UniProtKB/Swiss-Prot annotation:
Post-translational note: Proteolytically cleaved by PARL.
Keywords linked to the UniProt accession: Cell cycle, Cell division, Electron transport, Membrane, Mitochondrion, Mitochondrion inner membrane, Primary mitochondrial disease, Repeat, Respiratory chain, TPR repeat, Transit peptide, Transport
Pfam family, one: TPR_12
Full protein name: Tetratricopeptide repeat protein 19, mitochondrial
PANTHER family, per the entry: TETRATRICOPEPTIDE REPEAT PROTEIN 19, TETRATRICOPEPTIDE REPEAT PROTEIN 19, MITOCHONDRIAL
Entries under PROSITE patterns matching the protein: TPR_REGION
TM regions (residue ranges): none
Subunit comment: Binds to the mature mitochondrial complex III dimer, after the incorporation of the Rieske protein UQCRFS1. Interacts with UQCRC1 and UQCRFS1. Interacts with ZFYVE26 and CHMP4B.
Designated gene of the protein: TTC19
Zinc is among the record's keywords: no
Positions of the record's site feature: Cleavage: A71, A72
Length: 380
């Protein structure tokens, strides 16, 4: 009936990716740093099986790129690129950098096989020269690539290898980069129905960030910038959103509602009510209320989300409108629901979103069945 929208946090954390709620069986979550030692044997790639459940891969694709690679955070903090350039990096390091740039370009061009081959070359050269930063960064890129391709077992091993290197290099377990990897691992475990690990992963991410935020809230700006604090809050919002998604698909809408409420509050405070991802969270919160039969409350949030989506010409406007129509249908406002579905269909066609077009047409057919008996009874 509904399509959930994923949100992108500040600094491009997460690309929007809609997924359909009805019939989804995905369970979403991280083992912590343990796992493969540094010199991991990278498994051969395997194409993801088609039967993992509707809507799973769009979610994985969204999560996989919700931030820059975690290793990039470490690299940026220590000024690795700048230092290497100033010191006159040797030929091997320069070659690794070029390989990584080529790999990222291939990923952007949707050429995953080519990217994988290039990354293997970069990793081999990084090991030959014992360049630990390059090894870590390459593992992280390989993990993200495997993740978006649905190669969950490969991605798990590679994310753990990345985490092992980061922790071995002195990064703390509460660092945002570690939390980001943990969240990705969590989604892998959830998709594999490894529920104990999944739940533990979400709890680790959320509790660690909440404790971190509490400790850092009084720090002066010269010690920790406003932007750094905001990024940690936004990452918490991401974790709450992912956990809420897991709870909703696990048939726990009331618990999901509480998570979405917290995530929405964070997004409103930091990004504002008109931010595209704040609107996404309003829509998803409405979905959890609707799932509990609280149709009037759901309508309030969904109506507000759709109004804002129209004002800013939201890229997922057609999906928000489709969700609004679904709430109206549950409230037995069939005429209004039909009008909104038709508007959503028009927007979906303009976006050339064939999946949404098909979904909306199915909903219109279902609406027609529901409203026909009412029309007939009126005639009688």
């Amino acid at each position: 009936m509904f399509r959930l929208l994923s949100w992108s946090l500040g600094r491009g954390f997460l690309r929007a990716a809609g997924r359909r709620c009805r019939g989804c069986s995905a369970r979403l979550l991280p083992g912590l740093a343990g796992g493969p030692g540094p010199e991991v044997q990278v498994p051969p790639s395997r194409v993801a099986p088609h039967g993992r459940g509707p809507g799973l891969l769009p979610l994985l694709a969204a999560l996989a790129w919700f931030s820059r690679p975690a290793a990039a955070e470490e690299e940026e903090q220590q000024g690795a690129d700048g230092a290497a350039a100033e010191d006159g990096a040797d030929e091997a390091e320069a070659e690794i950098i070029q390989l990584l740039k080529r790999a990222k370009l291939s990923i952007m061009k949707d050429e995953p096989e080519e990217a994988e081959l290039i990354l293997h070359d970069a990793l081999r050269l990084a090991y030959q020269t014992d360049n630990k930063k390059a090894i870590t960064y390459t593992y992280d890129l390989m993990a993200n690539l495997a993740f978006i391709r649905g190669q969950l077992e490969n991605a798990e091993q590679l994310f753990k290898a990345t985490m092992s290197y980061l922790l071995g290099g002195g990064m703390k377990q509460e660092d945002n980069a570690i939390i980001e990897i943990s969240l990705k691992l969590a989604s892998i475990y959830a998709a594999q129905n490894r529920q104990e690990f999944a739940v533990a992963g979400y709890e680790f991410c959320i509790s660690t960030l909440e404790e971190k935020i509490e400790r850092e809230k009084e720090l002066a700006e010269d010690i920790m910038s406003v932007e750094e604090k905001a990024n940690t809050h936004l990452l918490l919002g991401m974790c709450l959103d992912a956990c809420a998604r897991y709870l909703l698909f696990s048939k726990q809408p009331s618990q999901a509602q509480r998570m979405y409420e917290k995530a929405l509050q964070i997004s409103e405070e930091i990004q504002g009510e008109r931010h595209p991802q704040t609107i996404v969270l309003m829509s998803d919160l409405a979905t959890t209320l609707d799932a509990q039969g609280r149709f009037d409350e759901a309508y309030i949030y969904m109506q507000r989300a759709s109004d804002l989506a129209r004002q800013i010409n939201h890229p997922e406007l057609h999906m928000v409108l489709s969700n609004l129509a679904a709430v109206l249908m549950h409230r037995e406002r069939y005429t209004q629901a039909k009008e909104i579905y038709q508007e959503a269909l028009k927007q979906a066609k303009l976006k050339k979103d064939e999946i949404s077009v098909q979904h909306i047409r199915e909903e219109l057919a279902e609406l027609s069945k529901k409203s026909r008996p009412l029309t007939n009874s009126v005639k009688l």
